[in-house]
């Protein structure tokens, strides 16, 4: 099943005089797009919000509230990009909030540095929390995960593999958490022990499990020699062709 995601960067650089009319136009335009018809058994449609962007610092038409209400009333998906919110907000907290009302969600997993910079995804705390919320809420089949990052200053193949593996590690780490035991402690109000057990879980043997996963998949943990070889043979030839032109 494919996912068609709609993100529209309409907005204004400075304070608007009318915040409603552009949103009415966007609502009606999206209705016209969806009215063209599509096979819902084969396609999921999602809408993606953003808090602000370059050139639209003061007002974004497709805000979080707009798209959550639009998706809920049209029976489509919300797509959450963890670089599209205020730095004090976390997508890991938004996932269970939306799962209380939506039967499916979509994600753009990225790594923002101070803003929506789309740095290469790394195995960091928020990525682990996103994975935990998906796993502990039995939402693996409900959440469509896409990666959203780029960095032209580094080898693109290495960036691709690093980000993919970071997400896989986070999901594996979430799968080995004692989720039921932790949930039980919370429900019983045993918050001191809950804190202790969650802290202990940070040192679960992810490394050994990750290496075993790679072994079963027939790939190695250290892939960088292959990246170097690809860089020397394929990318260098491509660069020579571009230079010649």
Model-derived segments and their meaning:
Residues 91-92:
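Acidic catalytic motifs of isoprenoid enzymes
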Residues 1-3, 21, 35, 41-43, ...:
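Alpha/beta catalytic barrel-like cores
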Residues 1-77, 180-181:
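Active-site acidic/histidine proton-transfer and metal-coordination neighborhood
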Residues 95-96:
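Glycine-rich, phosphate-binding/catalytic loops in enzymes
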Residues 73-77, 99-105:
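Glycine-enriched alpha-helix->loop->beta-strand junction motifs that scaffold or abut catalytic
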Residues 84:
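Short, glycine/acidic-enriched loop or turn micro-motifs at the edges of active sites
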């Amino acid at each position: 099943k494919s996912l068609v995601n709609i993100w529209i960067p309409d907005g204004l650089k400075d304070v608007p005089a009318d915040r409603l009319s552009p949103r009415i136009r966007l609502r009606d335009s999206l209705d016209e797009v969806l009215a063209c018809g599509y096979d819902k058994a084969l396609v999921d449609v999602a809408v993606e919000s953003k808090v602000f962007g370059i050139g639209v610092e003061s007002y974004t038409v497709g805000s979080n509230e707009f798209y959550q209400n639009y998706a809920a009333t049209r029976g489509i998906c919300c797509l959450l990009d963890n670089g599209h919110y205020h730095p004090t907000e976390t997508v890991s907290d938004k996932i269970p909030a939306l799962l209380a009302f939506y039967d499916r969600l979509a994600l753009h997993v990225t790594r923002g540095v101070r803003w929506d910079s789309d740095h290469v995804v790394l195995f960091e705390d928020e990525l682990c929390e996103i994975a935990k919320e998906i796993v502990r809420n039995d939402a693996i089949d409900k959440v469509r995960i896409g990666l959203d990052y780029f960095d032209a200053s580094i080898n693109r193949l290495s960036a691709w593999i690093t980000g993919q593996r970071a997400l896989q590690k986070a999901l594996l780490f979430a799968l080995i958490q004692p989720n039921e035991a932790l949930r039980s402690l919370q429900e019983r109000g045993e918050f001191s022990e809950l804190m202790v057990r969650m802290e202990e879980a940070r040192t679960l043997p992810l490394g050994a499990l990750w290496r075993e996963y790679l072994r079963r998949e027939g790939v190695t943990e250290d892939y960088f020699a292959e990246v170097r070889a690809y860089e020397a043979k394929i990318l260098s030839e491509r660069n020579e062709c571009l230079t010649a032109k």
